Design a protein with these regions (language model features):
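Feature captures the catalytic ectodomains and active-site-proximal regions of enzymes
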Residues: 1-373
Length: 373
């Protein structure tokens, strides 16, 4: 962690500032972190009866600006993004750290940075259950094909977060909250954790998503609505094939054409809903390299009490007593400046993941050292 590093802007330019902004557009009481900074809010004036937030997992700002600039002009349909942003603002936001999906979505739904809601990473040490857990499947991190295994140890997804969720808040304000997610995750533990007090619609394909959304918007309203749409297919393909693989571009093209069909069919008269499009994070190409595989570094593994948690691009290290100097020397000699390390206490007070006291229970999930590959 050095001068010049880019931190999430939790005070007005992060995804955690979206809930309070949505509250402002719906004209209800704010929730959690402050709304987006005035420069951002001024681009979207007015108040609305319905707000739609579409989250496209993995569609980061850099990738989107390249699409808008025409870098992928050979892929039919993507020109829509450049055409649309002639009339709609494109505003850069920071995610959270770490920007992995479970941490970022938890921040979005609690309007709080990761240290406060406790979902710190994709894989996390949970002392209360005595396990290194995958925080998407909520099973042991080593159980590759299992989902929900943590429930056998008493885990309750609806009681795990220490903070209220956005759905809780909106329900108390008389706002109906609707969540549209793919059927494969619509009632997963992570979805149950985040979508409390929400009516969940499970879609099976992009066509199902857009037609269902159109039907929901056309339903008579008894009050105000917040509609959250999560689309994860792009991120899944990026993880398997890389962020600019042709499959990724074709999937986004098909999704864009269906979205365009939906937008063209919206009623031209009457009060229109506000539609926001955001992401939880972007992606960069990170090829597998044997030099970074911990199985090839037994000397480093011998310095640890458990295997690294966190995620590949932000590992948390739990170090055996009297092995810290040996660990740091090994990392420095093996990878040099490409793997800087910071003590967990430094991260706790830096603001990178929010701020937390060193004696808070969430502190134990961070380990002793954090690596920044």
């Amino acid at each position: 962690m050095e001068a010049g590093d880019i931190f999430p802007n939790y005070t007005g330019a992060s995804i955690i500032n979206l809930p309070a902004s949505v509250c402002r557009w719906l004209a209800v009481q704010p929730f959690g972190a402050p709304p987006l900074a005035h420069d951002w809010l001024s681009n979207i004036p007015g108040q609305y009866d319905q707000v739609v937030l579409l989250l496209i997992d993995g569609l980061g700002y850099d990738f989107l600006t390249r699409i808008v600039a025409g870098d992928f002009s050979g892929v039919r349909g993507l020109e829509f993004w450049g055409d649309r942003f002639d009339e709609c603002p494109l505003l850069p936001l920071t995610s959270v750290s770490p920007s992995t999906t479970c941490a970022a979505l938890s921040s979005l739904w609690t309007a709080a940075p990761p240290l406060q809601h406790g979902m710190l990473a994709y894989e996390m040490w949970l002392k209360e259950f005595g396990i290194l857990s995958n925080m998407i499947s909520f099973s042991p991190a080593s159980a590759r094909s299992q989902t929900g295994g943590l429930k056998h140890s008493g885990f309750d997804p609806q009681r795990f977060l220490p903070l209220p969720t956005f759905g809780d808040h909106l329900s108390g304000q008389g706002v109906e909250t609707i969540v549209l997610q793919h059927t494969s995750i619509a009632r997963s533990d992570l979805s149950l954790m985040l979508s409390a007090r929400s009516e969940v619609y499970a879609f099976r394909a992009g066509s199902d998503l857009w037609l269902s959304l159109a039907e929901i918007l056309a339903q008579p309203k008894g009050g105000k609505r917040f509609i959250y749409v999560y689309w994860g297919a792009l991120d899944e393909l990026m993880h398997f094939y890389g962020p600019e693989d042709e499959r990724v571009l074709l999937e986004l093209s098909a999704f864009t054409l269906q979205m365009r069909y939906f937008l063209d069919k919206l009623p031209k008269q009457g009060k229109k809903p506000l539609m926001l499009i955001t992401a939880d994070h972007g992606q960069i190409h990170t090829p597998k390299q044997p030099a970074y595989d911990l199985r090839n570094h037994p000397q480093m593994a011998n310095c640890l009490t458990i295997m690294p948690s966190g995620e590949s691009r932000l590992p948390f290290l739990f170090v055996r007593p009297r092995r810290e100097d040996r660990l740091r020397d090994y990392v420095e000699k093996t990878w040099g400046k490409s793997f800087p390390m910071a003590a967990a206490e430094t991260v706790l007070t830096s603001g990178l993941m929010g701020v937390l006291s060193v004696d808070h229970p969430h502190r134990e999930r961070l380990g002793d050292w954090v690596v920044f590959p």
